[in-house]
Design a protein with these regions (language model features):
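Hydrophobic alpha-helix feature that most strongly marks membrane-spanning transmembrane helices
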Residues: 40, 75-78, 88
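C-terminal regulatory/interaction regions
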Residues: 80-143
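Short, charged, surface-exposed loops that flank catalytic or proteolytic processing sites
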Residues: 71-83
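Metallo-beta-lactamase
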Residues: 1-72
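Residue-identity detector for glycine
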Residues: 2, 9, 15-16, 23, ...
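Electropositive phosphate-/nucleotide-binding environments in soluble metabolic enzymes
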Residues: 60, 64, 77, 99-103
């Protein structure tokens, strides 16, 4: 604390798409809210280069983006894969591992349907849709 350095572990991805398939979108938002209360000059993320606190706000926007896309998917009656294919990543298009969007939508839709945050989801379906979104190519991870 005296050096104003925040070690975040796997909660923070800098430069890569977060992966919440086995976690929770709402839980991630709560954790990011807590992290934002720290007065740090330096953030050591679990993934990606050392950065500053602006990464926390960027990740919060990403999580809210996921919830917005998932809500539209529910309203439109489309699958996570269809929603992902129809989504412009906008400010998040430069993040690596963009196929994680599909897995994150699986998680968000599951939670919007009433599942407890962090409850197990159908990983085979989520990963299968991620591969399909990735053009049928195997997934890679640079984390």
């Amino acid at each position: 604390p005296d050096r104003r350095v925040l070690f975040t572990g796997d909660l923070v991805f800098n430069g890569g798409t977060p992966f919440m398939v086995m976690g929770s979108v709402t839980g991630s938002l709560a954790a990011l809210e807590h992290l934002s209360s720290f007065d740090a000059d330096v953030v050591v993320p679990g993934h990606g280069p050392v950065c500053d606190m602006t990464v926390i706000e960027r990740l919060r926007r990403y999580d809210e983006f996921i919830l917005d896309v998932a809500t539209r998917a529910v309203n439109d009656g489309v699958s996570p894969l269809e929603a992902a294919r129809d989504t412009d990543l906008g400010e998040f298009s430069e993040l690596s591992d963009s196929e994680r969007l599909v897995g994150n939508l699986h998680r968000a839709l599951f939670e919007l349907a009433g599942a407890e945050p962090g409850a197990p989801i159908d990983l085979v379906a989520a990963i299968g849709d991620m591969v399909a979104f990735n053009g049928g190519k195997p997934l890679t991870c640079l984390a």
